[in-house]
């Protein structure tokens, strides 16, 4: 109550921020007359003066913001016949300040971006504008290029259809580059696998504006970008596991101490499968193994777990579709197909086995990064969206981004009606169809939002039966997305769309539709996130247009069934709601929103938790990539580095074979064998007589230095440095890939440390640091072994870089993918444990009833 009084008197924090920006808008408006009286050439000349002031360091962007915004506004009027509204100027300032501008649908975010883009492109360091798909990247770049070109800027577009590094490099070399989040991220990973600086396509990460920032930085935050290569693991286990999974019976979850019946139970809240004691026994019999959870059968146990998930947690046409005999993921937030993306940890193979299509090879990660860490590399990050306030805390804590809600140019007239809740889905479906018929009879356009392809096809079939013409937009026909959405505001149009398919394309209406009440939005169930629901509502009522939105729910909807249906069901029972009747109440709507807040909080904590782990790997990634970039620099003294590594290798090897502290007792036979094997160099025991430990280390280092110099003396200095650089890079890349595998295994098992009263994150940091030290030593020592062992003829020396690049290119062409969401940290490895012995995790349960599941064996870093 007290807070509400304060807000009424002083306004919210957002109100105060907007008020500050409005003061500067008045200053920009005062310049409008000055610039509109200039000719085109005079306007360009004036802009060039400001650009020179930035390049010379005489002024910074904030000093010239008012004039530049006024010039961009005038340029928009002349080239596009579009004038930036006052609220759009505010949006531009918010973006320039490195914040998120929340602007409602139809408020012209594409035009707003031109203001900070031009201002920040003046430094010559480049500006990136990120969109959610190729269509929007190309459209926005083409539409706004008239402004940019007038002011002397070049514009490039990165598209997934472009296969050439040359095309990408040309786009990045432009002053302003548009593209999708995936392409920007993958180009960064690919650049850090190149063997020379000139082959890299990206330049400095200066300033980026992320359009639909909530979709990219929140919804896809748990989805890593992965470049991966094939493994040699057999796929037969997935076929066996699929057959076993089909024979296992699902039971109902019960509260302890009661034991569940059946072979397994499904935990829908955490999207997990729990195999019962009876299920373990049945699986062991069907597989023909004695202990499913022994280390020898660890992979088989994991494959069974994934097969059960595939059959019980993943629905065809909801979570994935079959296209050309391939399993294609459906993005849960947009309803679009995620081409090229595969579920990780064998889940995709389990789905392929379930659907009886060709099972593709498992892959090993070669390079990866999350969007969270990619976009945090930029010197300045900003974003635009129509829906961000519900996630303001996350934007602030994770990205240090403030969210500023920008007032609409014209007040919103859309009516957002309370939810209607029915007992069953069938009652809800019928009510939705009746409402569509009612609106359609008078010509009012209707947009029906569904949560899955399956649901959209249910409504499609019902509308066909009612003979109501309509369009369906889901992942199966997304190619026509823009056209279907553009027509959704026409008289009599009925459009069914999964989630936010068509986001970024405006639905425009004419005066006749305005008279009918505008576009009618019908949501057929609530999403787990209020933000996604708000995005659906936001399709109506753009730029002051009228519109209506309403959600139709049932107690059988997943959100209500899993997270809060009992309370609402009790209310309906008390009110005596009969079949076919609905309840409409603010109390019920608030109960639904509370269920959503509960889920949003769970997801936020999950993303925050995963980021804490990913930050550890990210610091290591940055260190390795920074070192890799140093190696690519022609001025880097690779020879000095090799000499240093030889010295460290010599000290390390000598220490392994010195049997006492004095150094008087050395196992020379084994030492000589090791040096001969690893460095192709003969050493004599006489060379080390009467020397201290340090002197012996130095002596070995000197011998190896001389041997190395003699070996490489037949090569020219330039050729030698090139060989050293490329081989060193290959060792580094291979060691980094092995390290990523080790880190995956570590993360998989670290969660169970909590059972031993240890903080898993602290343990992860400690052990990952030790792994990183091993990685550094491996790079040093393996590079020495490789440089001593290789033999080249002149032709091979000349072609070494080309060959390395060709092999890398093959790898890259066949292995770019998107990982699936990393929702859970996995479980630890166990040595062979008797079935009835206590589980090593410390839970107090028998091993066969608890955590026995294991990932692949942990490799050993050399």
Swiss-Prot record:
Q: Which Pfam families match?
A: P-loop_SecA, SEC-C, SecA_DEAD, SecA_PP_bind, SecA_SW
Task: Report the membrane topology from the UniProt record.
Answer: Peripheral membrane protein
Q: Summarize the subunit comment.
A: Monomer and homodimer. Part of the essential Sec protein translocation apparatus which comprises SecA, SecYEG and auxiliary proteins SecDF-YajC and YidC.
List the catalysed reactions: ATP + H2O + cellular proteinSide 1 = ADP + phosphate + cellular proteinSide 2
Keywords, ordered alphabetically:
ATP-binding, Cell inner membrane, Cell membrane, Cytoplasm, Membrane, Metal-binding, Nucleotide-binding, Protein transport, Translocase, Translocation, Transport, Zinc
**A biological process (GO) annotation for this entry?**
protein import
Which HAMAP family is this protein grouped with?
A: SecA
Keyword presence, Transport: yes
What does this gene product do? Part of the Sec protein translocase complex. Interacts with the SecYEG preprotein conducting channel. Has a central role in coupling the hydrolysis of ATP to the transfer of proteins into and across the cell membrane, serving as an ATP-driven molecular motor driving the stepwise translocation of polypeptide chains across the membrane.
Principal location class: membrane
> What InterPro entries has UniProt attached to this entry?
Helicase_ATP-bd, Helicase_C-like, P-loop_NTPase, SEC_C_motif, SecA, SecA_DEAD, SecA_motor_DEAD, SecA_preprotein_X-link_dom
Q: What cofactor does this protein call for?
A: Zn(2+)
Please state what class of enzyme this protein is: translocase
Identify the EC number(s): 7.4.2.8
Q: Which organism is it from?
A: Campylobacter jejuni subsp. jejuni serotype O:6 (strain 81116 / NCTC 11828)
The protein's name is Protein translocase subunit SecA
Say which family it is in. Answer: Belongs to the SecA family.
> Could you tell me where this protein is found in the cell?
Cell inner membrane; Cytoplasm
Q: Which residues bind ATP?
A: 88, 106-110, 506
Q: Which residues bind Zn(2+)?
A: 839, 841, 850-851
Extract the GO molecular function terms from the UniProt entry: ATP binding; metal ion binding; protein-exporting ATPase activity
Q: Does the keyword ATP-binding apply?
A: yes
Question: Superkingdom of the source?
Answer: Bacteria
């Amino acid at each position: 109550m007290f807070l509400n009084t304060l807000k009424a008197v002083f306004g919210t924090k957002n109100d105060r921020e907007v008020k500050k920006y409005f003061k500067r808008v008045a200053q920009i408006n005062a310049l409008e007359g000055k610039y509109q009286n200039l000719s085109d050439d005079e306007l360009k000349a004036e802009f060039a003066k400001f650009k020179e002031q930035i390049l010379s360091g005489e002024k910074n962007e904030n000093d010239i913001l008012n004039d530049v915004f006024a010039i961009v506004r005038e340029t928009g009027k002349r080239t596009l016949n579009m004038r930036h509204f006052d609220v759009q100027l505010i949006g531009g300032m918010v973006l320039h300040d490195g914040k998120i501008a929340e602007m409602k649908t139809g408020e012209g975010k594409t035009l707003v971006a031109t203001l900070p883009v031009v201002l920040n492109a003046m430094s010559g360091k480049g500006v990136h504008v990120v969109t959610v798909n190729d269509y929007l990247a190309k459209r926005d770049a083409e539409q706004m290029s008239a402004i940019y070109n007038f002011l002397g800027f070049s514009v490039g577009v990165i598209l997934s259809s472009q296969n050439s590094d040359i095309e990408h490099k040309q786009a990045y070399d432009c002053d302003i580059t548009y593209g999708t989040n995936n392409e920007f991220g993958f180009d960064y990973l690919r650049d850090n696998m190149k063997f020379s600086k000139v082959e890299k396509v990206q330049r400095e990460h200066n300033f980026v504006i992320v359009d639909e920032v909530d979709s990219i930085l929140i919804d896809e935050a748990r989805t890593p970008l992965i470049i991966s290569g094939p493994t040699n693991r057999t796929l037969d286990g997935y076929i066996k596991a699929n057959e076993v999974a089909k024979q296992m019976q699902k039971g109902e979850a019960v509260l302890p101490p009661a034991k569940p019946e059946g072979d397994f139970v499904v935990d829908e809240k955490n999207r997990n499968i729990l195999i019962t004691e009876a299920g373990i026994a049945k699986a062991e019999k069907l597989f023909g193994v004695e202990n499913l959870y022994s280390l020898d059968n660890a992979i088989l146990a994991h494959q069974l777990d994934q097969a059960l998930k595939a059959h019980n947690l993943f629905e065809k046409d909801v979570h994935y579709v079959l296209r050309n005999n391939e399993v294609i993921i459906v993005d849960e937030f947009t309803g679009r197909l995620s081409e090229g993306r595969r579920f990780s940890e064998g889940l995709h193979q389990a789905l392929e086995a379930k659907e009886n299509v060709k099972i593709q090879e498992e892959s090993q990660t070669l390079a990866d990064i999350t969007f969270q860490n990619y976009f945090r590399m930029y010197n300045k990050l900003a974003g635009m969206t129509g829906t961000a306030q519900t996630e303001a805390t996350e934007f602030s804590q994770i990205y240090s981004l403030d969210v500023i809600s920008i007032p609409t140019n014209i007040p919103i007239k859309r009516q957002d009606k309370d939810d209607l809740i029915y007992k069953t889905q069938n009652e809800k479906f019928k009510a939705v169809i009746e409402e569509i018929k009612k609106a359609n009879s008078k010509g009012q356009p209707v947009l029906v939002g569904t949560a899955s392809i399956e649901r959209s096809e249910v409504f499609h079939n019902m509308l066909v039966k009612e003979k109501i013409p309509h369009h369906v937009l889901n992942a199966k026909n997304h190619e026509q997305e823009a056209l279907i959405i553009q027509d959704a505001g026409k008289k009599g149009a009925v459009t069914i769309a999964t989630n936010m398919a068509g986001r970024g394309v405006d639905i425009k209406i004419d005066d006749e539709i305005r008279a009918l009440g505008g576009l009618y939005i019908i949501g057929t169930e609530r999403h787990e996130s209020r933000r996604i629901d708000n995005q659906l509502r936001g399709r109506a009522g753009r730029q002051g247009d009228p519109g209506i939105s309403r959600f139709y729910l049932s107690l059988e909807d997943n959100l209500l069934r899993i997270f809060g249906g009992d309370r609402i069901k009790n209310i309906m029972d008390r009110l005596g709601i009969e079949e076919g009747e609905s309840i409409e109440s603010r109390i019920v709507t608030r109960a639904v929103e509370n269920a959503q807040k509960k889920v949003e909080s769970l997801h936020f904590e999950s993303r925050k938790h995963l980021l804490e782990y990913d930050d550890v790997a990210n610091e290591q990634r940055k260190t390795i990539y920074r070192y890799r970039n140093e190696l690519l620099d022609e001025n880097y003294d690779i020879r000095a580095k090799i000499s240093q590594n030889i010295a460290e290798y010599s000290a390390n090897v000598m220490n392994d074979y010195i049997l006492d502290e004095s150094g008087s007792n050395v196992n020379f036979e084994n030492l000589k064998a090791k040096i001969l094997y690893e460095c192709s160099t003969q050493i004599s025991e006489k060379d080390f007589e009467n020397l201290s430990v340090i002197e012996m280390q130095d002596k070995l280092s000197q011998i190896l230095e001389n041997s190395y110099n003699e070996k490489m003396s037949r090569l020219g200095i330039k050729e030698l440095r090139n060989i050293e650089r490329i081989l060193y890079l290959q060792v580094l890349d291979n060691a980094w890939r092995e390290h990523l595998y080790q880190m995956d295994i570590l993360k998989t098992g670290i969660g169970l440390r909590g059972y031993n009263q240890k903080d898993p994150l602290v343990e992860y940091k400690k052990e990952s640091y030790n792994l990183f030290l091993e990685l550094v030593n491996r790079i040093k020592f393996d590079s020495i072994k490789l440089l001593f062992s290789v033999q080249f003829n002149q032709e091979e020396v000349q072609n070494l870089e080309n060959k390395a690049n060709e092999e890398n290119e093959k790898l890259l062409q066949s292995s770019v993918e998107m990982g699936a969401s990393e929702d859970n940290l996995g479980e630890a490895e166990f040595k062979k444990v008797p079935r009835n012995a206590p589980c090593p995790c410390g839970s107090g349960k028998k091993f066969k009833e608890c955590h026995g599941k294991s990932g692949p064996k942990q490799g050993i870093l050399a």
